[in-house]
């Protein structure tokens, strides 16, 4: 990618060495405004953006609020709180099937979100006090949401980053802030690329392009044979190649 673009990689507030402001309301829009200001102060009047998980939410709102500056966005996850709101009678069979599987996934896998969006401080104290508890809490997600077995060094580095910075609690506040200070979804006209990774569709359902087109101006849709929720870390070369192809095509 560096052969074709300048690459700016900001860290979300509250993760790793990036502190989170000591106030409520640090939602997608709050962060996206800081990203836009960052790019403006670096001298970029037009730029592309990419993200997954909370980064996908920030990227979506960035494109929604600054369509003249953001030439395109690349996503690998759909944030559930920004999902299209559609009457059931308007859904296709594929969309209905996806939502049914996804609701089942919610029942078995989304317990973490329930507690992190209501009592993040409570669970945070326990995880910050126990390296084993922190490793189990984070490591279980890699086991459940990925089809790639990360190296011990990678996992230990991830756990250590959370542990040494004591940032697991501040990272979980993303769930609280975006639940209680939500940003209303709206159609994003900015050209959008979406990467669908095989393992994510196994548990969360086969995400139909038509469903995403209710919210985004989808211009590129790539299905990958490997990878899951943590795609940029699991399959970095594939994600970088898809990013490069998409943004080069936008001129």
Segments predicted by a language model, with ranges:
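Glycine-rich "HGGG/HGxG" loop immediately N-terminal to the catalytic nucleophile
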Residues: 12-26, 60
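The feature captures the conserved acid-bearing segment of alpha/beta-hydrolase catalytic domains
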Residues: 88-120, 184-187, 213
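Alpha/beta-hydrolase active-site loop
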Residues: 25-41
